[in-house]
Design a protein with these regions (language model features):
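Gly/Thr-rich phosphate-binding loop signature of adenosyl cofactor/nucleotide-binding cores
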Residues: 1-39, 260-263, 267-315, 319, ...
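Actinobacteria-biased recognition of intrinsically disordered, low-complexity terminal regions
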Residues: 1-12, 180-200, 400-450, 518-523
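Small-residue-enriched alpha-helical segments and adjacent helix-cap loops
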Residues: 20-170, 175, 179, 201, ...
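Flexible, glycine/charged-enriched surface loops at secondary-structure junctions
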Residues: 51-54, 128-135, 229-279, 322-329, ...
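Internal alpha/beta scaffold segment
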Residues: 175-180, 200-235, 243, 247-249
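Short beta-alpha connecting loops at secondary-structure transitions
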Residues: 176, 205-209, 371-374, 492-505
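Long, low-complexity intrinsically disordered regions
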Residues: 183-185, 257, 261-291, 413, ...
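Glycine-rich, small/acidic residue-mixed loop/short-helix segments
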Residues: 481-523
Length: 523
């Protein structure tokens, strides 16, 4: 039983940190117009420390804010269309397939789903999502276009587009892959579906529900309403689906009934063996599209950009013709709408500015927590130490993305690291599971192609909380003092820092590159 509400920062709830207050702006699906991007850049420059951080949910953070700037910040966000509902500010947590509709992959363009779900979340009427203002700031929706990229990010409610133009609604945990089983025939009645659901394990997370594409966003919102009802029943003040006790789980039968009451037909999908989806980021570089236009995929060193870098991204978004910037849950950016002849010049501008535009960058696979001076608990300035580690040309510590040559491009200006609020141990946008930082998944090339053994992801932490560390197997570089680190390979067969660790090596910051390079090659 939780004794308090979650403390996730928002645009209206600033979080105090050692380097000033922190604001987190929810950006559903990571979708921004060029005008909105410019407005956010001005917020960072004029109110914050001049930098922006992309979180593991494709949201934005600004640090270094004055504690009294909340009213001005909110007014600027409202004017830019980035704060449609004060009551629902922190619940608009939606990740979406960032290349949806751009590269010919997937089964549907889920951008429309993003817009409709966001509207449903902010609908304050009883017939809409009025209850949803009670969701925790940690509750997450994922909208997958069928390629399986965001379906594995452990969202509370996930929609997966299917080849026949429909959708599967899944509730809870890490999800099976995009090859979802075929639903029952369209003639199956909801009452029969409910009876079949009652014979399952009783959790909608176990099988999923087939819904029409046009009903999918509303079905996702109603699944969240069902969660809130179960959370109240349980008296546990649960923040996430997985925290509900078994006797108060969101069941297939209960969810089918709630959807039916709202006029949404939902048919349970039979559980069948399916490979787990792998959450893989778009490959940095040009992304050809079937309409003759190209998108640009850019990774950000440690998830942070300077105001100048952000202005460049916003300017290119406006010049492209699409006037759109998409932030990814891997702390990258996708810019749609470029003519093929314009991509080379745009990528050169981005690379010259210190951003990652090729899949062979030494920054790929490297993450770090906030560290000093932003976090009082950190023992070291891990951002600076990580930048020196990556830039060490003699060691090539970061290795390369699998299947690439090893050239370290885009490492000129790390611009800092992703901002995780100091003191928030279980922040969902800091604690990263299942590879949702910009690193390859074991056994695949960057972007999902087959490859040989991959270099392990590296995470540099300022204290033993290890805020933001990846799941799976990873290299843990833990600060033990101002200039000292302990390097360990962790998580060989588990997701906790204590699982199956190798022997540790204690080194100075100057020796970190060698130690991490050796550990990263461990298989």
């Amino acid at each position: 039983v939780r004794g308090r509400d979650d403390a996730c920062p928002g645009a209206l709830r600033l979080h105090p940190a050692d380097d000033g207050s922190l604001a987190r702006m929810r950006v559903p699906g990571g979708l921004l117009t060029g005008r909105q991007a410019v407005a956010l850049g001005r917020v960072a420059e004029e109110l914050g420390d001049g930098r922006l951080d992309i979180t593991s949910r494709g949201n934005l953070q600004v640090r270094g804010l004055d504690a009294g700037c909340g009213a001005e910040l909110a007014a600027r966000l409202r004017a830019a269309g980035l704060l449609p509902s004060d009551r629902h500010d922190r619940v608009r947590n939606i990740v979406a397939s960032p290349l949806s509709g751009l590269d010919g992959g997937g089964h549907a363009d889920v951008v429309a789903w993003v817009r409709e779900l966001d509207a449903a979340l902010c609908d304050g009427t009883p017939a809409g999502g009025g209850e949803l203002s009670g969701l925790s700031g940690r509750f997450l929706f994922a909208l997958d276009d069928g390629r399986g990229d965001v379906a594995a990010l452990g969202a509370d409610v996930t929609l997966i587009a299917t080849p026949d133009g429909g959708a599967v609604l899944r509730v809870g945990g890490p999800l099976p892959g995009p090859d979802v089983p075929s639903p029952p025939t369209a003639g199956t009645r909801p009452d029969a579906a409910g009876r079949r659901g009652s014979r399952t394990a009783g959790s909608a997370a176990g099988s999923g529900l087939r819904v029409r594409s046009e009903d999918a966003p509303r079905a996702a919102a109603l699944a969240a309403v069902e969660f809130l009802a179960k959370a109240r029943e349980s008296g546990t003040r649960a923040w996430r689906i997985r925290e509900l006790p078994a006797r108060h789980a969101v069941t297939t039968e209960g969810l089918v009934a709630r959807l039916a009451d709202a006029g949404v037909e939902a048919v349970p999908v039979e559980r069948e063996p399916a490979p787990r989806a792998r959450a893989t980021p778009p490959v940095p570089g040009p992304v050809p599209g079937p309409n003759g236009r190209h998108a640009l995929s850019i990774a950000l060193p440690l998830g942070r950009v300077s105001a100048a870098q952000w202005r460049l991204l916003a300017g290119l978004a406006s010049r492209s013709g699409a006037d759109e910037l998409r932030m990814t849950p891997w702390r990258g950016v996708v810019l749609p709408g470029f003519a093929p002849d314009d991509t080379r010049g745009a990528l050169a501008e981005l690379s010259d500015a210190g951003l990652v535009t090729t899949p062979d960058s030494a920054w790929l696979g490297v993450g770090a927590c906030t560290g000093r001076p932003g976090c009082a608990k950190s023992l070291a300035d891990v951002r600076a130490d990580t930048a020196r580690m990556v830039a060490d040309p003699a060691r090539g510590v970061a290795g390369t993305a699998p299947g690439t040559s090893g050239t370290a491009r885009g490492a000129a200006d790390p611009a800092g690291v992703v901002a995780d609020p100091a003191g928030v141990v279980a922040d969902p946008e800091a604690v990263v599971a299942g590879g949702s930082m910009p690193w390859p998944v074991s056994g695949t090339a960057y972007g999902g192609g087959p490859a040989g053994p991959d270099p392990l992801p590296v995470y540099v932490s300022g204290c033993e909380r290890r805020c933001g560390h990846p799941g799976g197997r990873w290299v843990d570089a833990l600060a033990t003092g101002d200039t000292d680190y302990r390097v360990t390979v962790r998580g060989a067969r588990g997701d906790t820092p204590e699982a199956d660790s190798t022997d540790s090596v204690d080194v100075t910051a100057e020796q970190l590159a060698d130690a991490v390079a050796a550990a990263r090659g461990t298989t």
